[in-house]
């Protein structure tokens, strides 16, 4: 099958590639700012906001929660796709259930190093394949790919899978993050080709 004038892929591969995407080899590196240094003695991970039980975990405590492995493809808003990634980490759902989101909590803000943030609806984040991950393809994440921790949201463009994750905030407001205020889509569904904010409907407070 030929997609948008691009390369031809076998049918079983083509159906896994969203509109406007192309398959690439390797794992491209894209980021804003320098790679942060990791000091495990000073590092922590916070879950807070509109929850019944705010908590903070060390890196060792987080990794001891009962990791799982999830196979998932990755789609970058710049147009590349990689297939058959295997991620290892803790399900977001597990972290959320431990915190106990309050009824009014409808959005999650991901907080990362250097003040970077991103936003997604709680509904989207509660998918079974959403992970807080520390490994890919059986190996610890490389620093340029998010070590020590990154979010993985397979059903959204990859900027929502924020690198160098430090916290999750539950909120009742759709607060746009770093790239969202710079013109990128709130929901970022690659299968809907949701790349830019001008494509959003007037009511972007709910997941489509």
Which role does the model predict for each range below?
Residues 1-208:
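Structured, non-membrane catalytic/scaffold regions adjacent to prosthetic-group chemistry
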